[in-house]
Amino acid sequence: MSVQTTYSPVNQDEQVHDGLASRHVSCEGAPSDDSPYALSSLDHNPLGINVSFLLCFHAAQPEEGIRVLEDGINQLLKAHPFLAGDVTRPTRLSQRTNTMQIEPDAPESLLKIPMLQIRHHPATSIEELESKRLLPGAEEQEIIRQLAPLPIDMDLSLPQRPVLRFQANIMRDGVILAMTFHHAAMDGAGAARVLGLLADYCRDPAAPSVGVIPDRQLRSQIDRLATGCSPSASRADFSQHYCGLGDWAALLAENWPGFLQARATELVTWRLTIPGFKVQYLKGACNALLQGQTSALAGGTLTPTILSNNDIVSALMAMILRQAGQLAGKSTELSIAVDMRPSFHAPAFNNYLGNMVLLTYTPIPAAKDQAPVDGPRPPTELRQEDLEELTGIAARIRQSLLKVDAEYIQGVLSHLHSQTDWANIGFRGVPIPLSSFRNFEMIGLDFGETLGSQPRGFQLHLPVLGGMCFVLPKRQDRTEPWDLHLTLHRDDVSRIANDPLFRWAAGEHF
């Protein structure tokens, strides 16, 4: 992939400072907007890797589209200046160890890695990239190196790393806008919100940004809420779920580039599609069976009465992925990321950009042996025993989600806030982690006519770690297909591809 790199005027240091200066006026008597402030306890849960979201546009005039992006990013930084800052380690002593903070004013970092980079790929098309459904880890990492603004192998132990950067890639048939963010600074929903704000400013440079609550205020509010929570607010033992990565975390921090390089030869990324009509069939069949299974689900008021599409797809992927590698023939565990924003019942947190996620955990039983699918085409319906097991797993997933109420969230916040070493409060890893971006309306964003209005595609790129499953944002397609992004060991691809349940679900779409 041949490239040419240029830098946009939006990256100039004085322009970023203009955005910061506008915030000083409205914060009289408060700490200056360029002073560092602490990340919340929730920000210390995920591994602080770089994650990239890519939006693909069919722009007839890409150079004019770049100008629109420049103006939009300038407006975005005026509303949220911390996005141009860095995530750093505090130099002063505090009551906790291994904490992180945001340093909004980071001119040296901006000079080294501009806010918006522009790269030309005259020999590569969006269509060509989208056609690559199964990628070896090394090729996936090379694509990220070319298209993303921040290095995939940026050392995790660096004392200072950017919160967020953009790169506009001018392809042979359009523009790919890549946004890379530090996972300790925001979660997927926050990143999707940033792209939504950028779309507003690109479509209408005069879009108002009044009433924006400063990021530092919202992050500190989370920890104030945690301080007010009773340690006994929930009966759950959160130490089992928030125990960090232990020695593995130190290993990653010490040799992140080497770790990625080694994993790149072992893993593949797989983008596949489940037709919408199959998900609807499963939802109808499983909900019809649900009433007969409720007696097996202890929990009283937490017994689910209806299963959602997300419940069904999550259970389906758990049943498929339990066939991979060392999981085959064994019971395992599924984790699901849950956005807590709706539970706070505060409008300000609806637009919060930082981390606001917890994980639920669901046991997954070992798979039973199945006969291979005969013939070139899988059956149109699933076997009754498959439907019954799928219903049971989906119901337990829904049951775990129903436990996430106000009391449970208070217990999580209280537990995290009470810890003195925040390197040990990371999420506990499981063999099958799943995150759903299904309701992130990124494909429906309107960036204005210059960029071709709505993106025509979305891609997720992140370090190839293995064992991950993402449900991608819903496409603007009346058939409502379900797109997924998997990371597997290369030896597991054929095993999964020949699994009868996978063959039924994906069919000719993989």
Curated annotation (Swiss-Prot):
Keyword presence, Acyltransferase: yes
Transmembrane segments: none
Pathway(s) it belongs to: Secondary metabolite biosynthesis; terpenoid biosynthesis
Single GO MF descriptor: acyltransferase activity, transferring groups other than amino-acyl groups
Record keyword Acyltransferase present: yes
One GO BP: terpenoid biosynthetic process
The organism's place on the tree of life at top rank: Eukaryota
Listed InterPro entries: CAT-like_dom_sf (IPR023213), Plant_Fungal_Acyltransferase (IPR050317), Tri101-like_N (IPR054710)
Protein task: O-acetyltransferase; part of the gene cluster that mediates the biosynthesis of pyripyropene A, a specific human acyl-coenzyme A:cholesterol acyltransferase 2 inhibitor. The first step of the pathway is the synthesis of nicotinyl-CoA from nicotinic acid by the nicotinic acid-CoA ligase pyr1. Nicotinyl-CoA is then a substrate of polyketide synthase pyr2 to produce 4-hydroxy-6-(3-pyridinyl)-2H-pyran-2-one (HPPO) which is further prenylated by the polyprenyl transferase pyr6 to yield farnesyl-HPPO.
Protein name (Swiss-Prot/TrEMBL): O-acetyltransferase pyr7
Species for this entry: Aspergillus fumigatus (strain ATCC MYA-4609 / CBS 101355 / FGSC A1100 / Af293) (Neosartorya fumigata)
Keywords noted in UniProt: Acyltransferase, Transferase
Biotechnology remark: Pyripyropene A and its derivatives have very unique characteristics of selectively inhibiting the acyl-coenzyme A:cholesterol acyltransferase 2 (ACAT2) isozyme. Therefore, pyripyropenes are expected to be developed as a new type of anti-atherosclerotic agent. Furthermore, pyripyropenes have been shown to exhibit anti-angiogenic activity against human umbilical vein endothelial cells. Finally, pyripyropene A also exhibits insecticidal properties.
EC code: 2.3.1.-
Family that this chain belongs to: Belongs to the fumigaclavine B O-acetyltransferase family.
